[in-house]
């Protein structure tokens, strides 16, 4: 009997669920604090958030952002809690969604290549916890790729905000907002490329196409990099 891939990605031991939810709560709380400080321009928390807040509030700023998803979403609550709080919370929610989506796809892929169902409950729990730790490690390490005192295009930018030269993407909310869609797009691209020559069906491209569209509408530069690779 063929397994449902959606259920395979969602099913998890209680120990695995508790570990993931605890780390997700902790991670999201820390990120929300960071985004809140950035949106309210607390000294020492430089970012592009002030320009994003102005966009949500309808105030003309120094830049135009022709990719609307993040700003549309933030405006849903801005009328009630203000543009600054709305942008901070919206960015945190997109960041949370990226972690949840990555965890789902990692679970699904692990179950494809391992005999998960044949493991004892203890080993299943250990597998779930290891996958969770791997997911959070990926999200943390993706922001720490630059060694200290490394120069890039002539800039010694370690631990400082230097606009597009900053190694830490937490300063850029549009990048964070596109990650949920980009992660879906990545895994669905792998699926389409692995199946299109032997069992291609147009309906299997739906999620790939939608995620690519949403990614482009959230951060077009992602598409400029990914589409040529495909």
Predicted regions and their residues:
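Start-transfer (signal-anchor) and selected internal transmembrane alpha helices
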Residues: 1-34, 114-133
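Perimembrane helix-loop-helix junctions
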Residues: 1-5, 225-230
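Helix-to-loop transition at the C-terminal end of transmembrane segments
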Residues: 32-49, 144-152
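Short hydrophobic/aromatic helix or loop-helix immediately within or flanking a transmembrane segment
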Residues: 51-86
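Loop-to-helix entry region of an early transmembrane alpha helix in multi-pass inner-membrane enzymes
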Residues: 81-100, 129-132, 172-176
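Transmembrane-helix motifs of polytopic, lipid-linked glycan transferases
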Residues: 89-118, 184
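Membrane-interface micro-motifs in multi-pass membrane enzymes
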Residues: 126-190
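Membrane-interface alpha helices of multi-pass inner-membrane proteins
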Residues: 204-226
């Amino acid at each position: 009997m063929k397994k449902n891939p959606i259920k395979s990605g969602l099913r998890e031991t209680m120990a695995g669920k508790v570990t993931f939810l605890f780390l997700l709560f902790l991670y999201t709380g820390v990120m929300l604090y960071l985004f809140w400080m950035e949106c309210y321009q607390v000294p020492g928390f430089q970012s592009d958030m002030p320009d994003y807040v102005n966009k949500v509030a309808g105030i003309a700023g120094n830049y135009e952002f022709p990719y609307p998803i993040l700003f549309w979403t933030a405006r849903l609550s801005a009328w009630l809690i203000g543009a600054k709080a709305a942008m901070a919370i919206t960015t945190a929610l997109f960041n949370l969604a990226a972690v949840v989506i990555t965890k789902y796809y990692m679970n699904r892929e692990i179950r494809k290549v391992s005999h998960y169902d044949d493991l004892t409950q203890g080993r299943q729990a250990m597998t779930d916890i290891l996958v969770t730790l791997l997911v959070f490690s990926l999200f943390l390490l993706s922001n720490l790729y630059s060694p200290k005192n490394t120069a890039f295009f002539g800039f010694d930018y370690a631990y400082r905000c230097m606009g597009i030269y900053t190694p830490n993407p937490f300063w850029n909310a549009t990048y964070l907002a596109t990650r949920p869609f980009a992660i879906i797009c990545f895994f669905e691209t792998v699926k389409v490329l692995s199946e299109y020559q032997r069992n291609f069906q147009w309906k299997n491209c739906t999620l790939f196409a939608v995620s690519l569209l949403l990614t482009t509408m959230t951060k077009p530069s992602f598409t400029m990099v990914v589409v040529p690779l495909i």
